[in-house]
Swiss-Prot record:
Subcellular location: Cell membrane
Lineage: Eukaryota, Metazoa, Chordata, Craniata, Vertebrata
Entry's transmembrane regions: 218-239, 271-293, 305-322, 338-358, 374-395, 436-464
Intramembrane segments: 409-420, 421-428
Family: Belongs to the potassium channel family. S (TC 1.A.1.2) subfamily. Kv9.1/KCNS1 sub-subfamily.
Quaternary structure annotation from Swiss-Prot or TrEMBL: Heterotetramer with KCNB1. Heterotetramer with KCNB2. Does not form homomultimers.
InterPro entries linked to this entry: BTB/POZ_dom, Ion_trans_dom, K_chnl_volt-dep_Kv, K_chnl_volt-dep_Kv5/Kv9, SKP1/BTB/POZ_sf, T1-type_BTB, VG_K_chnl, Volt_channel_dom_sf
Protein's gene: KCNS1
SMART domains: BTB
Keywords attached to this entry: Cell membrane, Ion channel, Ion transport, Membrane, Potassium, Potassium channel, Potassium transport, Transmembrane, Transmembrane helix, Transport, Voltage-gated channel
Native species: Gorilla gorilla gorilla
Domain of life of the native organism: Eukaryota
Name under which the protein is recorded: Delayed-rectifier potassium channel regulatory subunit KCNS1
Topology, Cytoplasmic side: 1-217, 294-304, 359-373, 465-526
GO cellular component: membrane; perinuclear region of cytoplasm; plasma membrane; voltage-gated potassium channel complex
Length: 526
């Protein structure tokens, strides 16, 4: 179009821009407005009754103009009512002029639910999308929470207000049970630390042998020996508490004190003492080996299982230090040394926790307690309130009777064993009011304890299935696959592993584009 610059007054309307010439001096010119049509006058780029052809993530459909006119505020409704092609292109990702088709790079599953919304006027929640992804899709297509159907609105709002967790107790799908990619990347990052270390390949093999029982046959043998030593240590501790051993050691201790010698040298049975030394030597070997072979010393001391290993050998060495510190101060200090040694020996009970390294159930229990501190706190709060209330009622009803309800603190023990439905029977009410209070305490305990226990059990089931899936993945992988994994991280720096997430994400996006669904011969119409 030829454009002329004319000096004069400019007027602009919706159709065209008209320039009125300025009248020359001395001449009277009648002012008029041009009536010629603009370039788009009477010519629409789309017919108002034309069906809208869309392609969402490879899913092609045709939507009728009547269905879109019912919801003009949605993105497709605004696209249908667009006055120009330029305005329509701002609402979509791409436009095919030849096929007159609009393309959207969005979730195709939500688009099918969107088609159902244009038919019925109600939007239903998709289980395949999390609540936040579903909300983002709904906002993109111009749908608010009012568009949700009544059957899905309450569930959607509840999940949206609930803080997201790394697990879902109601889900048994492989995606929720299988190990997440973060765990695999953490293992690769730990293995990559050996790349620049001295004797890194040998240290890496030894570390996998000690940490992963399914790595090789020597790792399985090492795990069996470790379990046997832990069980032997626990058995020796239990046998040491038998009456015949206690009487024999007490007589030997009295004779040693009378002779002015330390009772610790003759207190233990020789066989049990040798077994204890062997167990301590094995535990010390495990701790020192894991510390020397660990890829990161800081991470070593932050791992709960490693802390348990340290606590299992700590009482023995503390006992030796106490003996060295108090051994030269005379027989009067031997009594204090014996008390200190008894306290340290009580810490040997923590050796049973070493089995958690070889037990799926114990590791799952630890993960459950770690993620259930709120539920455990609620359970303790419920029990504390119930015990306080029913203890006061029982004290009021039984204080005149000589049955053990003399004070309210004395009634706390009865309230605890009653609410937890243990019922030792050492203290029981005898009056009618006391028995009614006991009945209410027992029934209240059943109801109160059952509420958080269900949530904790669901979490335990989830973590147990997840741990079993991780062990199965390691067990099913053969030795050659482990060799490939080890060789793949040789020379790989930790920084490259941190940036690998972005590269893998781009690769997955490219794969999704290359695996787009095939085009149907004729798109369906709605």
């Amino acid at each position: 179009m030829l454009m002329l610059l004319v000096r004069g007054t400019h007027y602009e309307n919706l159709r065209s821009k008209v320039v009125l010439p300025t009248p020359l001096a001395g001449r009277s010119t009648e002012t008029f407005v041009s009536e010629f049509p603009g370039p788009d006058t009477g010519i629409r780029w789309r017919r108002s009754d034309e069906a809208l052809r869309v392609n969402v993530g490879g899913v092609r459909r045709q939507l009728s103009a009547r269905a879109l006119a019912r919801f003009p505020g949605t993105r497709l409704g605004r696209l249908h009512a667009a006055a120009s092609e330029e305005q329509a292109r701002r609402l979509c990702d791409d436009y095919d002029e030849a096929a007159r088709e609009f393309y959207f790079d969005r979730h195709p599953g939500f688009f099918l639910s969107l088609l159902h919304f244009y038919r019925t006027g109600h939007l239903h929640v998709l289980d395949e999308l999390c609540v936040f992804a579903f909300g983002q899709e709904a906002d993109y297509w111009g749908l608010g929470e009012n568009a949700l159907a009544a059957c899905c609105r309450a569930r959607y709002l509840e999940r949206r207000l609930t803080q997201p967790h790394a697990w879902d107790e109601d889900s048994d799908t492989p995606s929720s049970v299988d190990p997440c990619p973060d765990e695999i990347s953490d293992v690769q990052r730990e293995l990559a630390r050996y790349g620049a270390a001295r004797c890194g390949r040998l240290r890496r093999r030894l570390w996998l042998t000690m940490e992963n029982p399914g790595y090789s046959l020597p790792s399985k043998l090492f795990s069996c020996v470790s379990i046997s030593v832990v069980l032997a240590s626990i058995a020796a501790m239990c046998i040491h508490s038998l009456p015949e051993y206690q009487a024999r050691e007490a007589a030997a201790a009295v004779a040693a004190v009378a002779a002015g010698r330390s009772p610790e040298g003759v207190r233990d049975d020789p066989v049990l003492r040798r077994l204890e030394y062997f167990c301590i030597a094995w535990f010390s070997f495990e701790v020192s080996s894991r510390l020397l072979l660990a890829p990161s010393t800081r991470n070593f001391f932050c791992h709960p299982l490693n802390l348990i290993d340290i606590v299992s050998v700590l009482p023995f060495y503390l006992t030796l230090l106490a003996g060295v510190a108090l051994g030269d101060q005379g027989g009067k200090e031997f009594g204090h040394l014996g008390k200190v040694v008894q306290v340290f020996r009580l810490m040997r009970i923590f050796r049973v926790l070493k089995l958690a390294r070889h037990s799926t159930g114990l590791r799952s229990l630890g993960a459950t307690l770690k993620h259930s501190y709120r539920e455990v706190g609620i359970l303790l709060l419920y029990l504390a309130v119930g015990v306080s209330v029913f203890s006061g009622v029982a004290y009021t009803a039984e204080k005149e009777e000589d049955v053990g309800f003399n004070t309210i603190p004395a009634c706390w023990w009865w309230g605890t064993v009653s609410m937890t439905t243990v019922g030792y029977g050492d203290v029981v009410p005898v009056t009618v009011a006391g028995k009614l209070a006991a009945s209410g305490c027992i029934l209240g305990g059943i109801l109160v304890v059952a509420l958080p226990i269900t949530i904790i059990f669901n979490k335990f089931s989830h973590f147990y299935r997840r741990q079993k899936a991780l062990e199965a993945a390691v067990r099913n992988s053969n030795h050659r696959e482990f060799e490939d994994l080890l060789s793949s991280v040789d020379g790989v720096s930790e920084a490259s592993l941190e940036t690998s997430g972005e590269t893998s994400q781009e690769g997955r996006s490219a794969d999704l584009e290359s695996q787009a669904p095939s085009e149907p011969p004729h798109p369906q119409r709605y």
